[in-house]
Swiss-Prot record:
Superkingdom as given in the UniProt entry: Viruses
Protein name, per record: Major structural protein ORF14
Coiled-coil boundaries: 287-307
Assigned keywords, A-Z: Coiled coil
InterPro entries noted in UniProt: ORF017-like
Amino acid sequence: MLEKLNNINFNNISNNLNLGIEVGREIQNASWIKSPFFSITGTGADRGVRLFSVASQQPFRPRIKAQLSGSGVSGNTDFEANYDNLEILSQTIYPDAFGNSLRSKIKAYSELERIDFIKESVDSLTTWMNEERDKRIVASLTNDFTNYLYTQTMNVATIRKAIFHARNGLKGDNSKAFPIKPIRATMQSVGNVMVQNTSYIILLDSYQANQLKADSEFKELRKLYAFAGEDKGMLYSGLLGVIDNCPVIDAGVWNKFNVGMPNSSISDSDFMRYLNKANVSSIVTPRQFKEKLNQEKDEKKRSINKEISIGCLIGASAVLLAGSKETRFYIDETVDAGRKSLVGVDCLLGVSKARYQSTDGVVTPYDNQDYAVIGLVSDME
């Protein structure tokens, strides 16, 4: 992923700004390739993680149009008898600068060691940038759900219910919401008929993934995959399977060394570190979410005694990411009176779960609601 860096002469990099720009670009590209969100990220409205380019830390306001809901007119009725409303929805994202740096040992040890330090630092900073950004995406996705489903054990039925709710605009209590747009639709020819292929992405943590594998209905699905010869393809692509045309992914478990999906055993501070308070209306950590679930269960004379695992269904524009086009790469060889080198990277980044508000004060179904996320919650076992 960083193969192009092998052709760069690092001896003169501190005196060549163009080399620094090239290294920064390679770091940014490589950090995305390592990301599980890479395949669903882009600038289009049909991407799961939607990118916006910003040049400064000024607040950025992405906008969308709400679906027209009027009944129109018919016959000889004048237009003015029933005007529709073009609702523009927006939210504010506050980009922030984030970066990291490393300092070398004294240069007197060897010039070769200095060059190796720069190369190794580039690789380590790439991995750091990837994990830092991905944890911000995951934290934004799983913070303060407005729509979620809880089950003791993750299974095919719960995932199918989430997909049904997403397609038909329902909440966990079956109240009306709005349909979630699927991620990038493709046209597929079936015989002489063109069929639109749409899908949501299901992200589960490893505990939920193992629960799903133990589900008898999922085992039957796996037999169908094997019969169709698709099981090996899914194995090598990292997919658990496909349910109702929606890929199901084992995204791993959040911990200090891994991005993964969060659970209620992680500390509040570890989760909150990846949320910019300016970009959220409220913070509900996984621990607090478990307490919220317990309060709801208490009303039904039940309680959740175990930790909870948190996954989610995501649709188009679930997460909005406003950032600078390029990652800046720095080398300072004047540290400690010129005895040491400092290597660093930084960029602008604002991450927020899509949650829009009407711009003209008219209340819409979208106001303060997760635009394209449904939480999938189960006991952590």
